[in-house]
Design a protein with these regions (language model features):
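Glycine-rich, mobile lid/loop segments that gate access to catalytic sites or pores
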Residues: 107-204, 216-224
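Function-dense linear segments that define catalytic or interfacial modules
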Residues: 72-111, 125
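Terminal-appendage/accessory-domain detector
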Residues: 1-91, 190, 194-200, 207, ...
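Short acidic alpha-helix initiation/capping motifs at coil-to-helix transition points
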Residues: 95-96, 146-151, 426-430
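Hydrophobic face of alpha-helices
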Residues: 3, 7, 98, 116-119, ...
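Buried hydrophobic packing segments
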Residues: 98-105, 122-126, 150-158, 202-209, ...
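Alpha-helix N-cap/helix-start motif at coil-to-helix transitions, marked by capping-box chemistry
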Residues: 67, 92-96, 116, 120
Length: 471
């Protein structure tokens, strides 16, 4: 699981490197690192470590990007499109922070086994902490990708670099005191910045303790006055963590949610339910008769028509749409009437609207600056209700009901959509995600290098040759 999670992490990071905000952050990092560099050699590009990045009006040649800045960039970029994995206990995102921190501190001799062992340790700690503090932590408005992620990053770095005892305790302590991230940033660039800051602060804590004589508390999780008591007003003992450690493992149970589209994972069940409803409605006898076309013989033919017919939209037929959740299950979907595509990534209304208008989610619509009034009018016909039974923190279920103007009703319930732990992405799905940035032959070379290199740095060199990892 750790291996496919790393490829998925790269598949989320790579397309984000073409986004303006990500390139702007690269230029900001470049400005810090380019004193004495040849600025302006490529007037329409940024150059980092000798690699040209398209876009912009200036050139910043960075010869030595600090580990701290690498972590910031990787974390921000890999979470920017909200295309990265999520985990239910954490109620946040593992890989964006952990892999970003680990890549930043990587040494040329680090092996895959060491790299993935460190990731698993960081993920395990984050998942257990999430289990202990959620759902209260989430409902209070914290973004655990930031608040817990920095602790996981420190744990992963400590594992990779072989820290233990007092040294590890001080590293975790310095990370814990930097815990931050609030969910009001969702739908803005502030949310992916949480991931970048968590990775950066984990690396910074490690660097500070390695290169100075500073001393910190060695008991950051003291049951009476430590992190858990301060953040969540709960008492947690070392046994509460030890008794759950790798039993069976947070990557196994509850596992990871991975995405085929760049929007909040809380909407995945609803999106797939809407797609099933669309297919059922489109192939219904009443719809076929009314619109005077032959019903497709296969699902492939159906999907082909949905994706290629400009006037496919069902909205002229629809009276109302109801999205059914268990109580509180839509907390992360904070926008009921989004005004931008970015906000729409956290709106079940916008996502269901797309499916009913186009037959499937349209990724490019999450990049628009302003959502049209007619789209918002359609979204006003979508309502949320909370009439499904309450489920555990690790479960998700959503029902979508579409009522037509003629009174016909279509409904579907989904609890294990594509990308969920019980219906995981395959390697072919990961190749498709990589294909958003790379050509088929490039993907082949990346997978070949990933499979046959012993040291992580050798693989990263292949990635950079193929145009991934601009820092």
């Amino acid at each position: 699981m750790a291996r496919i999670a790393f490829l998925d992490y790269l598949a989320a990071l790579a397309p984000a490197e073409n986004e303006q905000a990500v390139q702007d952050l690269a230029r900001f990092i470049g400005a810090k690192s380019s004193i004495g560099s040849d600025v302006g050699r490529h007037m329409n590009s940024t150059v980092l470590n000798g690699k040209v990045i398209s876009g912009g009006n200036t050139c910043l040649v960075i010869e030595n990007v600090s580990k701290v800045d690498k972590a910031l960039y990787y974390g921000f970029a890999s979470h920017y499109l909200d295309f990265d994995d999520a985990q239910a206990n954490l109620a946040g995102h593992f890989s964006t922070v952990l892999y970003s921190a680990l890549l930043a501190v990587l040494e040329p001799t680090d092996t895959w086994n060491e790299f993935f062992r460190a990731y698993i340790i960081g993920a395990e700690l984050e998942g257990i902490i999430g289990y202990l503090i959620n759902p209260a932590h989430r409902t209070q408005g914290w973004h655990s990708t930031g608040t817990v992620g920095v602790i996981g990053a420190a744990a992963a770095i400590g594992a990779l670099r072989g820290l233990h005892g007092e040294s590890l305790a001080q590293l975790l302590s310095l990370a814990a005191t930097q815990s931050a991230g609030m969910f009001f940033q969702s739908g803005t660039d502030g949310k992916p910045l949480h991931a970048g800051l968590a990775a950066r602060n984990g690396v910074w804590a490690y660097e500070l303790l390695q290169h100075t004589s500073l001393q910190t508390s060695t008991n950051p999780f003291d049951p009476e006055r430590g992190w858990f008591k301060t953040i969540g007003n709960i008492t947690v003992t070392s046994n509460d963590i030890a008794s759950r450690w790798l039993a069976p493992g947070q990557l196994i149970d509850p596992g990871l949610w991975m995405k085929v589209h760049p929007y909040c994972s809380a909407a995945i069940c609803g999106a797939e339910a809407a797609e099933i409803v669309v297919h059922r409605l489109y192939t219904s006898s009443s719809y076929v008769s009314k619109h005077n076309y032959l019903s497709p013989d296969t699902e492939e033919q159906d999907q082909c028509r949905l994706c290629t017919t400009p006037d496919f939209s069902l909205w002229d037929e629809i009276n109302r749409v109801t999205v059914h959740f268990p109580p509180g299950a839509d907390a992360a979907l904070r926008y009921t009437s989004p005004t931008t595509g970015r906000e729409g990534q956290f709106s079940i209304e916008y996502i269901v609207y797309q499916v009913l208008a186009y037959g499937s989610v349209q990724d490019e619509l999450f990049k628009i600056d302003a959502i049209d009034t007619d789209v918002r009018d359609c979204m006003s016909r979508i309502e949320r209700v909370y009439d499904l039974p309450k489920v555990s923190q690790t479960e998700r279920i959503t029902k979508v009901t579409v009522t037509l103007k003629n009174g016909d009703t279509f409904t579907e319930t989904v609890n294990n959509p594509k990308g969920s732990p019980k219906n995981p992405l395959t390697m072919e799905d990961i190749r498709i995600k990589l294909g958003l940035t790379l050509e088929a032959d490039q993907i082949d070379r990346v997978i070949e290098a990933f499979t046959h290199t012993d040291e992580v740095e050798s693989f990263l060199q292949t990635l950079r040759k193929e145009g991934v990892l601009h820092v």
